[in-house]
């Protein structure tokens, strides 16, 4: 059974592409028809592609991997942040800083600065420093949180990227491709699908469409985590689940005989 229905996609407006004069011919295979100068996306293909992306991210999660959600356009910012947080993943929803992946050593120093400023405040330094200096530190902190808060706990490279609008996030995609990080993307009719490993042909401009698809990808990660957590709990407690079941069956039999 598909993880998303045609009805859900239609209600969210996922089928509306861009104007026919603004399109990428490589998206032709995902287009159903044209109506009033707008391309209509083939939702049967979207359903199939959502399944593929879902299963991929679920597997990444089952293997203990992390996913970086990227969506800096206004229509995507809130969904990317809330859904990444819900799934316990990382996100960038403001500006993509150059070298965020390819020069992570430098970026990680800036992330470390967030904790440094927090510690300064906790230790009471803000109370003894000149007011002007405290104001500057707070400005610096707010700026760092705005751009890097979503990756402050990212200690290593993500195992996958989820991107809303590859045209808008071309820098993120270029860095991920350079590092051979697989990319899942919501790809509208004006984008190049060849840059994306798992294409989800869909409207990337409607908030409801972006929210629906981003939430589905978060669901995939959460489902994968459930598989991991069950196995980890069993391993940590050194419990053979089959043996436990046999033991319970034996106890039940003995109780019946008594």
From Swiss-Prot:
Question: Domain of life, per the record?
Answer: Bacteria
What does the entry give for GO biological process? translation
Q: What Gene Ontology terms describe what this protein does at the molecular function level?
A: structural constituent of ribosome
Against Pfam families, the record matches this protein to:
Ribosomal_S2
PROSITE patterns listed in its UniProt record: RIBOSOMAL_S2_1, RIBOSOMAL_S2_2
Chain residue ranges for the region called Disordered: 226-258
Q: Which InterPro entries match?
A: Ribosomal_uS2 (IPR001865), Ribosomal_uS2_bac/mit/plastid (IPR005706), Ribosomal_uS2_CS (IPR018130), Ribosomal_uS2_flav_dom_sf (IPR023591)
What keywords are annotated for this sequence in UniProt?
Answer: Ribonucleoprotein, Ribosomal protein
Gene Ontology terms: cellular component: cytosolic small ribosomal subunit
Please state which protein family the record places this protein in: Belongs to the universal ribosomal protein uS2 family.
What name does UniProt use for this protein? Small ribosomal subunit protein uS2
